[in-house]
């Protein structure tokens, strides 16, 4: 069975559950005025929310693809990611 988690009136699924797997659409910060650490926290909070909605958590993540627009932001991103992923 496939379960799609779509925003009200949306056409893009934020998350899809299929055969015991959860696939999330791109997760980005809403507040671009934040520094990289703040933006990363905001995106990861959203991921936590979507995973919980699907009945799972970050402890079960198998793979993650991350896009960073400027390598100067890697240290800040990595700091927040490492604290989040435990």
Residues covered by each model-derived region:
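N-terminal presequence-like segments and the immediate start of the first folded domain
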Residues: 1-62, 68-86
């Amino acid at each position: 069975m496939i379960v799609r988690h779509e925003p009200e009136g949306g056409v893009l699924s934020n998350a899809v559950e299929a055969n015991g797997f959860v696939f999330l659409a791109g997760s980005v910060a809403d507040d671009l005025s934040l520094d990289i650490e703040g933006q990363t926290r905001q995106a990861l909070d959203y991921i936590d929310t979507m995973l919980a909605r699907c009945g799972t958590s970050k402890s079960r993540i198998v793979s993650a693809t991350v896009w960073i627009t400027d390598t100067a932001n890697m240290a800040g991103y990595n700091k927040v990611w490492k604290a989040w992923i435990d």
